[in-house]
Amino acid sequence: MIHLIAQALWLGGIVFFLVVLGPAVQELEPKLAIKTLDRGRTGLETVSWIAIGLLLASGIFNLVVRAQAGTMPGEAWGILLGAKLLLFSAMVVHHSLQVFKYGPVMSRLVAQLPRSVPAWPESLLSQWRRWFLLLKINAALGPIAVLLGLALTKN
């Protein structure tokens, strides 16, 4: 159950950011939009790391319990698990790039903003575009990982 809640937490945060927060800030004046998006980004990072930790812990626990019970299915199950772990790993790498590569640059650029910002600075906009691309990739990979997880429960 914890595994499912953690998946919903991470994917829900991604979907909220893409469907609600991202489009909503476009209606705001640039400085407020930038600060709102940056605050949302740091919140999503926190929620995502909590979910990733829960997914790792509960996934390992589930695997150990299954192994100790001697109910490890065959080769097809192993292939499904490998595919799911590959997708999960890719999502964690993407999230790490967002947090450790783009996040600090965006935070620094936001902190350097003048009092009045008539438009998005190109340097900041460029960073956000890269950040959002990784978020969209994770939004595509996440449901596939969930479907693989469901397939694992059927075997």
Where are each of the predicted segments found?
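Polytopic transmembrane helical bundles with strong interfacial aromatic enrichment
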Residues: 1-155
